[in-house]
């Protein structure tokens, strides 16, 4: 079971070589409406691209931070300042653990942004939570692109689990395995 406590903390901003992971903001709604209006995008993660649905999804994402101490960030491309997706961490009661999550707008697929953002999020959470033993990713088995990202992040499929009415594959990386592969890499900078 996940305990829900108000951490009172602010949401950090992370920076990688090509991306900034910053707190979600009301001004992101139009960008996320555009992303969620792409049927090829929503085929794998669901949702719909109307402003009310996007706003409510963002409110839930933002609410994850004070309730659990983790949550997703807006992913912004550094050179252009363009909102290109959402990535970070997620958990809720009944969830298999703290989950690394990501999605990138379709015109930016294939650039490694999901892996870069996922790496930053996992580095951050293992750095902030010294007693956390693993991070998971919950992926629909047909979402081959996300499975490949999880595998590039060093995750392995550990089980199937029925969540939100569908069967999902749960991928896991342990703290020990993560730290062993990241020993020579620096954590993302926090601004």
Where are these regions (language model features)?
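Short amphipathic alpha-helix in the helical subdomain of ABC transporter nucleotide-binding domains
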Residues: 51-54
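A short helix-loop-beta-strand connector motif used in the catalytic cores of GNAT acetyltransferases and
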Residues: 61-74
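Short Pro/Gly-enriched beta-strand edge/turn motifs at strand-loop
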Residues: 56-58
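Acyl-donor (CoA/ACP) binding surface of acyl/acetyltransferases
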Residues: 1-47, 72-191
